Amino acid sequence: MRIGSIEELQAYFTYSPDRDIVVSGHRGGMMAGYPENCIESCEKTLSLLPTFFEIDFSFTKDSIPVLMHDLTIDRTTTGKGRVSDYTYEELQQFALVDRHRKETPYKIPRLKDMLEWGKDRVVFNFDNKYVNTKGVSDRVRRASIDYYIRQLQPGGDWAEYHNIVLSVRSLDEALRYWNSGIRQVMFCVEISSRADFEAYDASPIPWRYIMAYIRTAVDPRLQEVYDLLHARGVMTMTSIVE
């Protein structure tokens, strides 16, 4: 799936009544033998079905963004400690483990390696864990958003990519990107009420930049909200908990 512009990204995520369901590979997929946030896992998932990938990253001691959901490596690797305790090269001594804690031959990838692998192949949904993780200071939260903005602006490391969706936790966060001139990504935002819908409807962000997240189930009580979103061409996203 080649996405060469924001217009092509928006077209891919435009709702229509006859549109097929698109399955998101959460953290790249979590099959036995395939760890989360791993290029090889994404490759395996993509070989099975058309999809896009929600991924997470944390920063190493030498400030390299690597694919890692947690701020520590304990749960998903054979090592222990915070991601920021190690340089990228030091992290390569550890192996990734699958969801059953089985060791795999795979290593922690850099974000830039994942982006290059996925270029012209798949869409990525970046989930900024620094925004909503407990124990992260307000200063670090702000700094993480500023980092995203710098990377997306002209000359930034992500500026050349047109296959990025940003998960944001609030309208205020979305507006920080929008008011900084970020126009080459879409935003995945929670719209689980009429009030949420009206807040975004009144914002300067056009609906063509929005994908609406509606939590873990389709709720008949929110049918009016779904209809309003669909009338604006907005696709909705929900989570299926295994």
Predicted region positions:
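Phosphate-group recognition and catalysis centered on beta-loop-alpha active-site segments
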Residues: 1-242
